[in-house]
Regions:
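Multi-pass alpha-helical transmembrane bundles in non-GPCR membrane proteins
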Residues: 1-219
Length: 219
């Protein structure tokens, strides 16, 4: 690990999500080129860009928060960065659903489903801004409820085909296992590889599975 990341308050968490932000940026470029090459319509292109933006937003906010040590930042600034970090989880979940809801689901049902998710995401962001010390389990349950919202529209999602469903399920499982680690604060394999660092790896894995689903089945 480079000296830059070793200076961070949480070196492993910072490094994993800093590289995640870089990967999300280039992944967004790949999705853009894929959409243009495939002649995707504007709805598909816009939905894919929303997904890419949500990835970049989450990983950038997370990397910045986990880099800045408390000795450098005042409590107020660090608290705001923490709020931003946690808030972006809602944005990522809604952003991950957007391509599938807007392109693969029948309309206008897909648009309504997408709108509901974004309304919940906005409510979650506002909740984080004004109730940052909410119980850990409360926000995690809301994350999981949003993440598995596809069960409410299963008939429409099941029509996308088994390969796409497997990628979506794999991503959802990665996020869900990470959420469990976050609630129980386990396992802690070493001083560097704590439950939080493992959570970051699982988020990266979940994002990759969903990126592949967008790349191969939406565009």
């Amino acid at each position: 690990m480079s000296q830059f990341f070793r200076q961070a308050q949480d070196p492993v968490s910072c490094a994993t999500h800093a590289w995640g932000a870089v990967a999300a940026f280039f992944g967004g470029m790949v999705l853009l080129l894929r959409a243009l090459w495939a002649g995707a319509n504007m709805a598909a292109l816009a939905a894919a860009m929303v997904f890419a933006f949500s990835l970049m937003a989450l990983y950038s906010a997370s990397a910045i928060y986990h880099y800045c040590p408390g000795s450098v930042l005042s409590g107020g600034i660090k608290r705001r960065l923490r709020k931003l970090d946690h808030s972006m989880i809602y944005v990522l979940i809604a952003g991950s659903y957007t391509p599938f809801a807007m392109v693969l689901m029948p309309q206008p049902k897909g648009a309504r489903f997408c709108l509901i998710l974004w309304c919940v995401a906005i409510a979650g962001v506002l909740g984080k801004l004004f109730w940052i010390n909410a119980p850990r389990a409360f926000s995690t349950v809301l994350y999981l409820a949003m993440g598995w919202a596809l069960l409410f529209v299963w008939k429409d999602f099941s029509a996308v085909g088994m390969p796409c469903l497997l990628l979506l399920a794999a991503g959802g499982i990665c996020y869900s296992v990470g959420a469990v680690f976050y609630i129980v604060k386990r396992p802690n394999l070493s001083p560097d590889w704590t439950f939080h660092a493992l959570l970051h790896l699982l988020i990266l894995a979940g994002s990759l599975f969903h990126f592949l689903a967008v790349f191969f089945f939406v565009l």
